[in-house]
């Protein structure tokens, strides 16, 4: 039993320092069961010592609070504020993984606490001119890509970071998420599409994931929902990319087109079909390609 108690004494929080002994009895030397009943997150022993052993435990405390709806006990919270500078020594990948887990909970606003405690100072250079309402992120689909993009762009908009893209790169996010965020940031600086053709051109240039993220982030930041318009375009089945075009490069090769001419013709036909969606038919497009080539 003494070995078990020693092992439990090294755990992070009391709720995680509960075990069954060899004789089937519950070993709970730090009152973890009681803390669970009180919905409380409390460090095992001296909080500063636990956080000095592994600074990631500070993020874990916030993550458990976000996921379970538990309250962080006063001494533990005070220790997080005092030990926050230790978070700068953590590998970005470890910090990234904890942030993502928080963002994917029903309480993403917990990231405001991480920022105010100083856990993010290595990545957030500014004080910000307004506190982002990260709680709104909970209304977005529970997808890592979507929530990372919204989180980074909100930080950028309110002056906490100079670049959403660079912020995600610092945290070692994957290339797809970084590209999506950079493009979504560009889209948010532009006027929204005014018609179906505008939506299709945007989808063609940036892709479904990026446009969807931008639209959902736009709703979170500005309170204006344009997602219905986007969904209508996607449900319509109208062509906005070469993969939806009724003809392929092989079809145009058969007409004698090759090299740059073939690519130019495909793009011409795509532009035509985006404007006249009912004409996305193989026969019509082949005839148009022949006519255009002859003229």
Where are these regions (language model features)?
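Divalent metal-dependent catalytic cores for phosphoryl transfer on phosphate-bearing substrates
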Residues: 132-224
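Conserved, surface-exposed functional patches that form binding/active-site neighborhoods
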Residues: 35-42, 218-231, 247
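Glycine- and charge-enriched loop/helix tracts that form the active or gating conduit
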Residues: 2, 6-170, 244, 261-266, ...
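Hydrophobic, well-ordered secondary-structure elements that form the walls
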Residues: 185, 252, 256, 276
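Charged, low-complexity, helix-prone segments enriched in Lys/Glu/Asp/Gln
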Residues: 15, 36, 183-188, 213-217, ...
């Amino acid at each position: 039993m003494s070995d078990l108690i020693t092992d439990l004494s090294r755990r992070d929080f009391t709720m995680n320092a509960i075990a069954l002994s060899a004789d089937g009895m519950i070993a709970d030397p730090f009152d973890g069961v009681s803390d669970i009943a009180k919905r409380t997150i409390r460090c095992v022993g001296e909080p500063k010592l636990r956080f000095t052993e592994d600074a990631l435990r500070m993020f874990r405390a916030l993550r458990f609070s976000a996921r379970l709806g538990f309250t962080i006990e006063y001494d533990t919270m005070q220790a997080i504020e005092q030990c926050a500078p230790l978070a700068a020594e953590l590998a970005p990948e470890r910090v990234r993984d904890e942030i993502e887990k928080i963002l994917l909970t029903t309480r993403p606003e917990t990231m405001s606490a991480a920022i105010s405690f100083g856990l993010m100072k290595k990545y957030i250079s500014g004080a910000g001119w307004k506190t982002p309402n990260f709680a709104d992120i909970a209304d977005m689909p529970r997808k890592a890509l979507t929530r990372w993009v919204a989180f980074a762009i909100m930080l950028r908009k309110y002056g906490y970071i100079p670049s959403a893209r660079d912020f995600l790169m610092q945290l070692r996010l994957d290339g797809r998420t970084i590209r999506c965020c950079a493009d979504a940031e560009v889209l948010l600086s532009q006027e929204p599409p005014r018609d179906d053709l505008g939506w299709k051109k945007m989808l063609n240039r940036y892709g479904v994931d990026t446009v969807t993220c931008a639209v959902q982030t736009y709703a979170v930041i500005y309170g204006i929902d344009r997602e219905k318009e986007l969904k209508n375009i996607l449900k319509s089945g109208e062509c906005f990319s070469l993969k939806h075009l009724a003809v392929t490069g092989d079809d145009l090769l058969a007409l004698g087109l090759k090299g740059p001419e073939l690519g130019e013709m495909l793009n011409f036909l795509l532009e035509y079909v985006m404007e006249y969606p009912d004409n996305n038919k193989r026969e019509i497009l082949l005839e148009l390609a022949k006519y255009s080539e002859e003229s």
